C-alpha cells in the first residue's frame, strides 16, 4: 500500500511514531516550468533557481542545475542528469553555510567519469544482482554484468537512472524529476514511469520521494548515492571522514555476504561486532577491526536491516555528526534496509577534479542508501523482492534531516 508524502517533517517528531497526514500530499500545485534562463521563484521564504549545467556529449541534450534555498540559507543543488544531488549546504555551529557532499561543477564528470555514482538516483535496481539474472513470472531476464569482473549487475548498470537526463518540473517547495524507461531498456522489463521528488523545508530537512509505475511486472529499487562529509565538502583527503561519529539505533542485524558482497541469505547479529552502532561510535575506532565481513569490503559497505520495519512508518535509520562543524545528519526512511558505505573504493587516479578542485580520496565521505536488501529477488530468505506489479505504484521515501549539535 503506497504512503502519502509528507513535506512537513519536524526535528522534534519521534520518527517511529510519525503519522503521515494525507491532506499534505502535494498540496502545493506545480508551476509550469517555462524558464529558459536562470529563474527565481520564492514561496514562504523558498527560492528556486535554474541554470545551465552543461551539454551531455552522448545525446547533445542540455543538462540543468536547480538550486532550492530555504529561509535559513540552507540549499540543495539538483541536476537533471541523473536526478542527482550535486551539493547540500547547511549552517554549521558558527553560522557559516557549508557544503557537506561530494560533487562536481558541471555535467561532464558525471557523464564521462561517474566515479562512485556521486549523488545520483540509483535504479532501476540499487545494489547488486548476482549474475545479473532474475526471474519474474517464470520469465528469466539477463542484465548487464558491470561489476566484479563481469559477475554481478550493480546499481542499474552502465545505463542506469543516474546517467539519464530527467525532465524537471518546479514545485512551490521543490523539484519533481521524471524519466520514462522503455521496455527492456538495459534489460529490465516494462515501460516504467519513474519520478523523484525533492523538497527542502525550513527546518533543513530534505525529503526525497520515489514513485514508479509499470505496464509489466518489473524490478524497482531506487535510492540516492550521496557521499556526505559533515566536516565540509572540501575535505577530500584519504580518511577525512573517519572522525565522524555514527549511530545506527534501529538495526540489530546486517545481511551476511560473500567476498563480492552478494548476500548469502543469512542474517548476522551485530552484537559484539564492529557493526554495532546502536551506541554511537567514532568511525576511526572501528573501521579497521579484525572481522571477515569488514575485511572483505575494506571498510564499511554493509546492508543494515531496519528493526520494526512496516513499509509505511518513517524510521530513524542512522545519525551522523561532526565534532568539527557541529553539523548533524539524521536519516529516516520507510524502506527495509540501507547500505552503509565509507567510500572504500574512491581514490583512483582517473577520477575527475571535485567542485573544490581536488580529487576525492578513499574514505573521504560516507553514504547511507535506504533500499530493499541486495539481490533480494534471488534470495529466498528475503521477504520483499522489489517487484513492482503492473498497474501498481512504487512509493517510498527518504529524509535527510540536518541540524546542529546541542
Roles of regions detected by a PLM:
Residues 1-43:
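Non-Sec secretion/translocation targeting segments of pathogen effectors
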Amino acid at each position: 500500500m503506497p504512503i502519502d508524502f509528507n513535506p512537513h517533517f519536524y526535528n522534534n517528531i519521534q520518527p517511529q511514531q510519525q503519522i503521515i497526514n494525507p491532506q499534505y500530499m502535494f498540496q502545493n500545485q506545480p508551476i509550469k516550468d517555462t524558464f529558459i534562463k536562470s529563474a527565481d521563484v520564492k514561496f514562504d521564504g523558498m527560492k528556486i533557481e535554474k541554470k545551465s549545467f552543461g551539454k551531455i556529449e552522448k545525446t547533445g541534450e542540455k543538462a540543468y542545475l536547480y538550486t532550492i534555498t530555504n529561509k535559513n540559507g540552507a540549499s540543495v543543488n539538483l541536476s537533471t542528469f541523473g536526478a542527482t544531488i550535486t551539493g547540500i549546504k547547511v549552517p554549521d555551529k558558527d553560522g557559516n553555510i557549508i557544503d557537506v557532499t561530494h560533487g562536481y561543477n558541471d555535467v561532464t564528470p558525471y557523464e564521462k567519469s561517474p566515479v562512485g555514482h556521486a549523488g545520483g538516483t540509483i535504479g532501476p535496481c540499487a545494489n547488486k544482482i548476482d549474475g545479473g539474472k532474475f526471474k519474474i513470472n517464470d520469465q528469466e531476464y539477463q542484465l548487464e554484468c558491470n561489476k566484479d569482473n563481469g559477475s554481478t549487475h550493480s546499481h542499474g548498470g552502465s545505463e542506469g537512472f543516474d546517467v539519464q537526463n530527467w525532465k524537471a518540473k518546479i514545485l512551490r517547495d521543490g523539484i519533481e524529476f521524471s524519466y520514462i524507461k522503455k521496455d527492456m531498456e538495459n534489460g529490465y522489463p516494462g515501460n516504467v514511469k519513474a519520478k523523484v521528488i525533492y523538497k527542502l523545508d525550513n527546518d533543513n530537512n530534505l525529503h526525497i520521494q520515489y514513485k514508479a509505475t509499470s505496464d509489466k511486472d518489473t524490478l524497482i529499487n531506487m535510492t540516492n548515492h550521496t557521499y556526505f562529509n559533515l566536516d565540509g565538502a572540501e575535505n577530500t583527503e584519504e580518511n577525512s571522514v573517519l572522525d565522524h561519529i555514527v549511530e545506527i539505533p534501529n538495526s540489530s542485524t546486517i545481511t551476511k555476504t560473500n567476498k563480492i558482497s552478494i548476500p548469502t541469505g543469512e542474517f548476522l547479529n551485530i552484537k559484539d561486532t564492529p557493526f554495532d552502532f546502536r551506541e554511537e561510535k567514532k568511525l576511526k575506532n572501528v573501521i579497521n577491526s579484525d572481522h571477515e565481513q569488514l575485511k572483505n569490503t575494506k571498510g564499511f559497505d554493509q546492508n543494515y536491516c531496519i528493526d520494526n520495519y512496516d513499509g509505511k512508518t518513517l524510521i530513524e535509520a542512522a545519525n551522523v555528526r561532526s565534532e568539527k562543524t557541529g553539523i548533524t545528519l539524521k536519516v529516516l526512511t520507510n524502506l527495509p534496509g540501507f547500505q552503509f558505505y565509507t567510500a572504500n573504493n574512491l581514490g583512483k587516479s582517473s577520477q575527475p577534479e571535485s567542485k573544490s578542485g581536488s580529487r576525492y580520496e578513499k574514505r573521504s565521505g560516507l553514504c547511507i542508501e535506504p533500499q530493499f536488501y541486495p539481490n533480494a529477488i534471488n534470495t529466498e530468505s528475503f521477504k520483499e523482492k522489489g517487484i513492482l506489479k503492473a498497474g501498481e505504484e512504487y512509493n517510498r521515501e527518504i529524509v535527510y534531516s540536518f541540524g546542529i549539535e546541542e
